[in-house]
Amino acid sequence: MRLALLATLILLPAAASAQARQLTTADSALVGRILLAEDRRDSSDAAIAEGARHSDPRVRTIAIRARGRIRDSRFAARDSLPPVPAPPTWPEPSWRLRLRALTAKSDCNVLRIALADSAWPVRFRATDLLTPACAGDDAIATTLREWVDALPADASRRRAGGVSWHAAAHAGVALARVRPTEALQRMSRLASHRQPQVRAYAARAATVLSDTLRLRTLARDPDDNVKEAAIEGLSKLTAHADDDIYVATLNGRGAQAVRAAAVALKGSPRADVRAATSSAYARWVVLGNASAHDVRAALLEAAGRLATEDRPPPVHAELLPQAVALALGADIRLRVTMAPASGGGSFVVRLRGDVAPLMASRILALARARYYDGLTWQRVEHDFVIQGGSPGANEYVGLSEFIRDELGNIPHLRGTVGMSTRGHDTGDAQWFVNLRDNQRLGRDYTVFAEVVDGIDVVDGILEGDIIASIDEVLPRP
């Protein structure tokens, strides 16, 4: 397969005049049929064979690439494709190098200094590394107490470069490890705070403290992300002693909480669990949400059945507006504007339709439909990626219909934008932005865009920051 692809591509004319030839309406229609065949995963479609024989190298590449992706889910032959423009190169912020240098969990002197760093991501990293080895360091304990005690009643807003709930949440979990008694004294305030992220972190702190009473309360929280964190912690501490809570959670609508409950119920000795989880599975099947596959799989396993019994709804092949133009290299850009309550600012991404036209056109359509407005960046790992665009602010809640992979030859470099998946062809419309070079991700994840402006805003995003809007913008002249 790889040799055949290479041999075919060697025949592609290199002349610039050939690349610049104006395509006809019929040519564009052929590209559209090729893209539809790729989306259907139909390598027998005549459009692919016709495209592979086309006189224009752009059309031939699109057809050959489609055939390769259909036949090989990993598309190992992608490296034999003609090279594409490289993404922009972005320098690292100096603070990330300091963050990266923090590795020793027992070096209390280094961690104490890092807690006073000028960059909050470095402080968070130091906080998250703290262990009981630093229990005797009064300066560290004082800093953690001050952060928790400074938590405002309304922690929904922050200025650029600052924090709102974040410091107190991280400090609460660290204090549970370093000074459990002092953490217990502050748990009531954290666990009842109006900001759901604070309550979720309180559940993690309660897990460290083995505070099962608090976890039982949080497992009934109105926010599904809080429920998820509490159930995961409670099941670790009490095994099946709290199966009543997990069975009751199965009736909820939050995918993440129901999944956590199903995982907790696996192996339960209760006779009613099989029927309860099977009934919940049937309800989730009726919803027809492809992104809820993980929930359905967990429910099947809790019922003593095989997760492979689940069959997500089929992908509906559709040629969206701009897909053909993107495939042929159209420069389409989106501006991601952050909410003022999340520090404001914006960054611009260029869609890489030359490599992932189906995915890029789907993202463009969702942005035009205002799908992302008001959603958050729910996952922030300051030396890895930011991820967001979930209606439930959770990795298990995504678009109701899967988006297929379009693995290509753009490396996952700093500033590239990829599609979140949990398996082949399971794109859920959640973005992730690479904060550093993550080339190992290229094996499984599609790059569909790249940051072309505002990387400093990307670097400054914190967990829970809100996307105000995503709008199409014209390229700069």
Model-derived segments and spans:
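Sec-dependent signal peptide recognition
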Residues: 2-7
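Hydrophobic h-region of N-terminal signal peptides that target proteins for export
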Residues: 9-18
